[in-house]
């Protein structure tokens, strides 16, 4: 996202999503002009991060929701370590299998970001990690079923 796009989008959106690469500066307790501009909007901000944001000065800021993410297309399940997932509000999926977001949900993630495609045969950057509508429906069904487990 570009800083000038914030002004363009602001009247039409309820929240902004910051990709992992653009959010890294916050983990060093610094921020970019893009982050500052988005925070100034006072809208909810969702930020993907591979590293726990727990020690970030913005960690408890009500306006920000944090998603755990491995910034790789595709991400192999063996690369996922959900050990710190509870430091995050959710999970941004880059795995081609539905098991990763399902597990994140079962571990308490309140926000799940998945990529969706209309056509798996197309060649897009994220199409190899995108779910078609049938897979998305299966994922949602499994999540709803898992919510019936006693806690």
Q: How would you describe each model-predicted region?
A:
Residues 1-151:
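Catalytic cores and adjacent flexible loops of soluble metabolic enzymes
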């Amino acid at each position: 996202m570009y800083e000038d796009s914030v002004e363009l989008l602001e009247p039409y959106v309820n929240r902004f999503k910051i990709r992992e690469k653009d959010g890294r500066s916050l983990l060093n307790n610094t921020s970019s002009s893009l982050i500052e501009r988005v925070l100034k909007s006072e809208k909810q901000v969702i930020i993907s991060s591979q590293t726990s944001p727990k020690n970030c000065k913005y960690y408890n800021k009500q306006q920000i929701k944090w998603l755990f993410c491995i910034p790789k297309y595709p991400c192999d399940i063996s690369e996922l370590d959900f050990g710190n997932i509870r430091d995050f509000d959710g999970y941004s999926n880059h795995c081609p299998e539905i098991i990763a977001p399902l597990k994140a949900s079962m571990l308490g993630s309140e926000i799940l970001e998945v990529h969706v495609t209309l056509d798996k045969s197309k060649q897009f950057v994220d199409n190899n990690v995108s779910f078609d509508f049938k897979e998305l429906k299966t994922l949602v069904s499994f999540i709803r079923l898992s919510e019936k487990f006693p806690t």
